[in-house]
């Protein structure tokens, strides 16, 4: 099994506050940097937050998927592999609750990256999706180059480890909530039903949040 560990030291960049309509605002997670620029002749400092980089993958239908396909969407990401005998089935069962809650909602996606692309071919991913009852384009199972996926995982504040000396894969599963600007807004234990309920509630909060 492959180890997925949410990186220690996630930086909380935005304290929870309130909208004018008294709705909770989710924090922005990850690194940030200050950028100085001139606007209307005035020097101002802006904050640039960590975002998910450009991607290029293939989904379970054989369609090419890149970051442009996620533009303007709130989405949840996770990492898995189809032969995982332990927590992946629990994660995917819990992700089905998220899928069923939002499958008819516009502006929402789920992206699940396989960390074993050698085994998880497109036909394998399609059979896996069919077994889960996934249809349509709300939830994509994505296959790409392993090294690229490992780098992408880091951008989600998740680390991926290779096989251990015994030849086994080990992984912890987390669901990562991304906003329309591709910023990280929450991390959730995908094996914990209470955490998944919180994720569903936070998606609703994020959908109500104005894009600034």
Where are the predicted features?
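Thiol-based oxidoreductase modules, predominantly thioredoxin-like and allied folds used
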Residues: 107-121, 137-149
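Thiol-/selenol-based redox modules, centered on thioredoxin-like
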Residues: 163-212
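Coil residues (strongly favoring Ser/Thr
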Residues: 46-47, 64, 105, 121
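N-terminal targeting signals for export/organelle localization
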Residues: 1-54, 212
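Short active-site neighborhood of thiol/selenol oxidoreductases, capturing the structured segment around
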Residues: 65-95, 111
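Short, internal strand/loop/helix patches
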Residues: 126-172
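Short loop/turn microsegments at loop-to-beta-strand junctions
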Residues: 52-53, 75, 172-174
């Amino acid at each position: 099994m492959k180890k997925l560990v949410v990186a220690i030291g996630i930086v909380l960049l935005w304290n929870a506050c309130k909208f004018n309509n008294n709705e909770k605002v989710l924090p922005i997670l990850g690194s940030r940097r200050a950028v100085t620029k001139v606007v209307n002749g005035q020097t101002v400092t802006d904050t640039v937050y960590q975002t998910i980089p450009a991607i290029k993958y293939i989904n379970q239908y054989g369609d090419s998927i890149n970051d442009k396909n996620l533009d303007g969407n709130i989405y949840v990401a996770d990492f898995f592999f189809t032969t995982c005998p332990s927590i992946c089935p629990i994660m995917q069962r819990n992700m089905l609750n998220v899928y069923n809650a939002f499958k008819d909602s516009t502006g929402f996606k789920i992206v699940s990256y396989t960390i074993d692309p050698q085994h998880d071919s497109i036909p394998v991913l399609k059979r896996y999706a069919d077994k889960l009852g996934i249809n349509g384009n709300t939830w994509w199972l994505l296959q790409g180059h392993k090294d690229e996926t490992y780098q992408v995982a880091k951008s989600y504040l998740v680390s991926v480890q290779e096989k251990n000396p015994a030849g086994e894969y080990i992984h912890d599963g987390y669901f990562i909530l991304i906003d329309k600007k591709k910023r990280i807004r929450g991390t959730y234990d995908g094996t914990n039903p209470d955490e998944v309920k919180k994720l569903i509630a936070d998606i609703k909060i994020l959908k109500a949040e104005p894009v600034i």
